[in-house]
Amino acid sequence: MILIEHILGNVKKDPVWQAKLKNATVDLLVLDQREAQKSRCRKSTLQGLDLGISLDRHVVLADGDVLTWDEESNVAVVVQIHLRDVMVIDLSELKNRSADELIKTCFELGHALGNQHWKAVTKNNEVYVPLTVATTMMDSVMRTHGFQHLPFRFVKGAEILPLLTNSEARLLFGGAEDTDTHVHVASPLDEPHGSGLHIHSIHSHGDGHSHDHDHSHGDHDSDHKH
Protein backbone atom coordinates (compact mmCIF):
# COMPACT_ATOMS: atom_id res chain seq x y z
CA MET A 1 0.00 0.00 0.00
CA ILE A 2 1.20 3.50 -0.85
CA LEU A 3 0.40 6.09 1.82
CA ILE A 4 -0.85 9.44 0.51
CA GLU A 5 -0.53 12.26 3.06
CA HIS A 6 -0.27 15.26 0.75
CA ILE A 7 -1.80 16.46 -2.51
CA LEU A 8 0.90 17.41 -5.01
CA GLY A 9 -1.25 19.71 -7.12
CA ASN A 10 -4.27 19.77 -9.40
CA VAL A 11 -4.11 19.12 -13.11
CA LYS A 12 -7.47 20.85 -13.69
CA LYS A 13 -6.36 24.14 -12.13
CA ASP A 14 -2.55 24.30 -12.29
CA PRO A 15 -0.93 25.02 -15.69
CA VAL A 16 2.37 23.63 -14.39
CA TRP A 17 0.82 20.22 -13.75
CA GLN A 18 -1.09 20.39 -17.02
CA ALA A 19 2.23 20.76 -18.83
CA LYS A 20 3.91 18.02 -16.77
CA LEU A 21 1.21 15.46 -17.43
CA LYS A 22 0.54 16.38 -21.05
CA ASN A 23 2.36 13.29 -22.35
CA ALA A 24 2.36 11.28 -19.12
CA THR A 25 0.67 7.99 -18.33
CA VAL A 26 -2.18 8.81 -15.96
CA ASP A 27 -3.63 6.21 -13.59
CA LEU A 28 -7.00 7.29 -12.18
CA LEU A 29 -8.27 6.97 -8.63
CA VAL A 30 -12.03 7.07 -9.24
CA LEU A 31 -14.15 8.23 -6.30
CA ASP A 32 -17.84 8.90 -5.87
CA GLN A 33 -19.07 12.06 -4.15
CA ARG A 34 -19.23 10.44 -0.70
CA GLU A 35 -15.71 8.99 -0.89
CA ALA A 36 -14.38 12.36 -2.02
CA GLN A 37 -15.45 13.95 1.28
CA LYS A 38 -13.34 11.57 3.35
CA SER A 39 -9.86 12.63 4.39
CA ARG A 40 -9.03 8.99 5.12
CA CYS A 41 -9.85 5.97 2.98
CA ARG A 42 -8.22 3.04 1.21
CA LYS A 43 -8.88 2.30 -2.44
CA SER A 44 -7.18 0.97 -5.54
CA THR A 45 -6.61 2.89 -8.77
CA LEU A 46 -7.88 1.65 -12.11
CA GLN A 47 -4.47 0.03 -12.66
CA GLY A 48 -4.67 -1.75 -9.31
CA LEU A 49 -2.36 0.47 -7.26
CA ASP A 50 -3.32 0.19 -3.58
CA LEU A 51 -3.54 3.65 -2.01
CA GLY A 52 -4.11 4.65 1.59
CA ILE A 53 -5.41 8.23 1.78
CA SER A 54 -4.50 9.96 5.05
CA LEU A 55 -4.93 13.71 4.68
CA ASP A 56 -5.36 16.42 7.29
CA ARG A 57 -8.95 16.59 8.56
CA HIS A 58 -9.70 19.89 6.83
CA VAL A 59 -8.46 18.62 3.46
CA VAL A 60 -10.75 16.85 0.98
CA LEU A 61 -9.89 15.53 -2.45
CA ALA A 62 -10.93 17.42 -5.57
CA ASP A 63 -11.33 16.30 -9.14
CA GLY A 64 -7.92 16.49 -10.83
CA ASP A 65 -5.79 16.24 -7.68
CA VAL A 66 -2.38 14.70 -8.34
CA LEU A 67 -1.53 12.11 -5.68
CA THR A 68 1.68 10.56 -7.01
CA TRP A 69 4.16 11.52 -9.72
CA ASP A 70 7.13 9.48 -10.90
CA GLU A 71 9.10 11.69 -13.23
CA GLU A 72 11.44 8.89 -14.26
CA SER A 73 8.67 6.58 -15.46
CA ASN A 74 6.41 9.50 -16.43
CA VAL A 75 3.46 8.05 -14.51
CA ALA A 76 1.01 9.93 -12.27
CA VAL A 77 -2.02 9.04 -10.18
CA VAL A 78 -4.83 11.57 -10.55
CA VAL A 79 -8.20 11.77 -8.77
CA GLN A 80 -11.39 11.54 -10.81
CA ILE A 81 -14.58 12.34 -8.92
CA HIS A 82 -18.06 11.49 -10.11
CA LEU A 83 -20.42 14.15 -8.73
CA ARG A 84 -24.15 14.37 -9.19
CA ASP A 85 -25.60 17.15 -11.32
CA VAL A 86 -26.94 20.15 -9.42
CA MET A 87 -30.07 22.25 -9.80
CA VAL A 88 -29.15 25.93 -9.48
CA ILE A 89 -31.98 28.28 -8.50
CA ASP A 90 -31.26 31.98 -9.12
CA LEU A 91 -32.74 34.23 -6.43
CA SER A 92 -31.35 37.50 -7.83
CA GLU A 93 -34.68 38.69 -9.22
CA LEU A 94 -36.16 38.65 -5.73
CA LYS A 95 -34.07 41.72 -4.91
CA ASN A 96 -36.48 43.75 -7.04
CA ARG A 97 -39.51 42.59 -5.06
CA SER A 98 -40.97 43.94 -1.84
CA ALA A 99 -39.57 42.71 1.45
CA ASP A 100 -42.83 40.91 2.24
CA GLU A 101 -42.83 39.09 -1.10
CA LEU A 102 -39.14 38.20 -0.79
CA ILE A 103 -39.65 36.70 2.67
CA LYS A 104 -42.77 34.82 1.55
CA THR A 105 -41.09 33.34 -1.54
CA CYS A 106 -37.94 32.29 0.33
CA PHE A 107 -40.00 30.66 3.08
CA GLU A 108 -42.17 28.79 0.60
CA LEU A 109 -39.16 27.68 -1.44
CA GLY A 110 -37.42 26.40 1.68
CA HIS A 111 -40.58 24.55 2.69
CA ALA A 112 -40.95 22.98 -0.76
CA LEU A 113 -37.33 21.79 -0.88
CA GLY A 114 -37.48 20.53 2.70
CA ASN A 115 -40.71 18.67 2.00
CA GLN A 116 -38.83 16.69 -0.66
CA HIS A 117 -35.99 15.96 1.80
CA TRP A 118 -33.58 17.63 -0.65
CA LYS A 119 -30.26 18.94 0.59
CA ALA A 120 -29.45 22.53 -0.37
CA VAL A 121 -26.78 25.19 0.00
CA THR A 122 -27.52 28.91 -0.46
CA LYS A 123 -24.64 31.04 -1.74
CA ASN A 124 -24.08 34.03 -4.03
CA ASN A 125 -27.84 34.63 -4.45
CA GLU A 126 -28.27 31.06 -5.64
CA VAL A 127 -29.56 27.80 -4.16
CA TYR A 128 -27.68 24.61 -5.04
CA VAL A 129 -29.63 21.34 -4.86
CA PRO A 130 -27.97 18.00 -5.78
CA LEU A 131 -30.08 15.80 -8.03
CA THR A 132 -31.57 12.75 -6.34
CA VAL A 133 -34.37 12.21 -8.87
CA ALA A 134 -34.74 12.86 -12.61
CA THR A 135 -34.48 16.48 -13.76
CA THR A 136 -38.05 16.28 -15.11
CA MET A 137 -39.33 15.52 -11.61
CA MET A 138 -37.35 18.38 -10.04
CA ASP A 139 -38.64 20.66 -12.79
CA SER A 140 -42.20 19.56 -11.96
CA VAL A 141 -41.72 20.32 -8.27
CA MET A 142 -40.51 23.85 -9.05
CA ARG A 143 -43.31 24.64 -11.48
CA THR A 144 -46.15 22.99 -9.60
CA HIS A 145 -45.27 24.89 -6.42
CA GLY A 146 -45.34 28.17 -8.34
CA PHE A 147 -41.62 28.92 -8.59
CA GLN A 148 -41.48 29.10 -12.39
CA HIS A 149 -40.69 32.82 -12.07
CA LEU A 150 -37.36 31.90 -10.46
CA PRO A 151 -34.75 31.02 -13.11
CA PHE A 152 -33.26 27.58 -12.52
CA ARG A 153 -30.95 25.33 -14.47
CA PHE A 154 -29.14 22.01 -14.18
CA VAL A 155 -25.34 21.92 -14.24
CA LYS A 156 -22.55 19.46 -13.58
CA GLY A 157 -21.53 19.09 -9.95
CA ALA A 158 -17.92 19.77 -10.93
CA GLU A 159 -18.94 23.32 -11.90
CA ILE A 160 -20.33 24.01 -8.43
CA LEU A 161 -17.68 22.28 -6.31
CA PRO A 162 -15.04 25.07 -6.68
CA LEU A 163 -17.56 27.59 -5.32
CA LEU A 164 -18.07 25.70 -2.06
CA THR A 165 -16.18 25.49 1.19
CA ASN A 166 -15.26 22.01 2.41
CA SER A 167 -18.19 21.96 4.85
CA GLU A 168 -20.61 23.13 2.15
CA ALA A 169 -19.29 20.45 -0.22
CA ARG A 170 -19.83 17.79 2.44
CA LEU A 171 -23.38 19.02 3.02
CA LEU A 172 -24.23 19.18 -0.68
CA PHE A 173 -22.50 16.07 -2.00
CA GLY A 174 -21.68 13.87 0.97
CA GLY A 175 -24.18 11.01 0.90
CA ALA A 176 -26.65 12.74 -1.40
CA GLU A 177 -27.13 9.44 -3.15
CA ASP A 178 -28.55 7.96 0.05
CA THR A 179 -31.23 10.60 0.48
CA ASP A 180 -34.61 8.87 0.40
CA THR A 181 -36.56 9.78 -2.72
CA HIS A 182 -39.65 11.62 -1.56
CA VAL A 183 -41.35 13.61 -4.28
CA HIS A 184 -44.90 14.90 -4.17
CA VAL A 185 -46.12 17.03 -7.04
CA ALA A 186 -49.75 18.05 -6.68
CA SER A 187 -51.28 21.38 -7.51
CA PRO A 188 -53.02 23.23 -4.64
CA LEU A 189 -56.02 23.43 -7.00
CA ASP A 190 -56.31 19.66 -7.28
CA GLU A 191 -59.27 17.92 -5.70
CA PRO A 192 -58.43 15.90 -2.55
CA HIS A 193 -58.46 12.73 -4.63
CA GLY A 194 -57.18 14.36 -7.81
CA SER A 195 -54.36 12.95 -9.84
CA GLY A 196 -50.79 14.14 -9.40
CA LEU A 197 -47.24 12.90 -9.59
CA HIS A 198 -46.26 10.89 -6.53
CA ILE A 199 -42.77 9.43 -6.27
CA HIS A 200 -42.37 7.75 -2.91
CA SER A 201 -39.49 6.79 -0.73
CA ILE A 202 -37.87 3.44 -0.10
CA HIS A 203 -36.54 3.27 3.43
CA SER A 204 -34.08 0.85 4.90
CA HIS A 205 -34.10 0.23 8.63
CA GLY A 206 -30.74 -1.49 8.85
CA ASP A 207 -32.31 -4.85 9.61
CA GLY A 208 -32.20 -6.21 6.10
CA HIS A 209 -35.77 -5.07 5.41
CA SER A 210 -36.98 -2.16 3.37
CA HIS A 211 -40.40 -0.86 2.53
CA ASP A 212 -41.91 1.81 0.38
CA HIS A 213 -44.56 4.31 1.39
CA ASP A 214 -47.51 5.12 -0.81
CA HIS A 215 -49.23 8.26 0.42
CA SER A 216 -52.49 9.71 -0.81
CA HIS A 217 -53.86 13.12 0.04
CA GLY A 218 -57.14 13.63 1.84
CA ASP A 219 -57.60 10.21 3.40
CA HIS A 220 -54.14 8.92 4.30
CA ASP A 221 -53.51 5.44 2.98
CA SER A 222 -50.23 3.62 3.38
CA ASP A 223 -49.11 0.57 1.49
CA HIS A 224 -46.21 -1.17 3.18
CA LYS A 225 -44.13 -3.89 1.61
CA HIS A 226 -41.65 -5.83 3.70
UniProtKB/Swiss-Prot annotation:
One of its GO terms (cellular component) is cytoplasm. InterPro entries: UreE (IPR012406), UreE_N (IPR004029), UreE_N_sf (IPR036118). GO terms for biological process: protein folding. Residues 192-226 are annotated as: Disordered. It is found in: Cytoplasm. Residues 204-226 have a biased composition (Basic and acidic residues). CDD domains: UreE. Signal peptide: none annotated. SMART domains: UreE_N. Its main location: cytoplasm. Gene3D superfamilies: Urease metallochaperone UreE, N-terminal domain. One of its GO terms (molecular function) is nickel cation binding. Keywords: Chaperone, Cytoplasm, Nickel, Nickel insertion. NCBIfam families: PRK13262.1 (NF009761). HAMAP family: UreE (MF_00822). This is Urease accessory protein UreE. It comes from Yersinia intermedia. The gene is ureE.
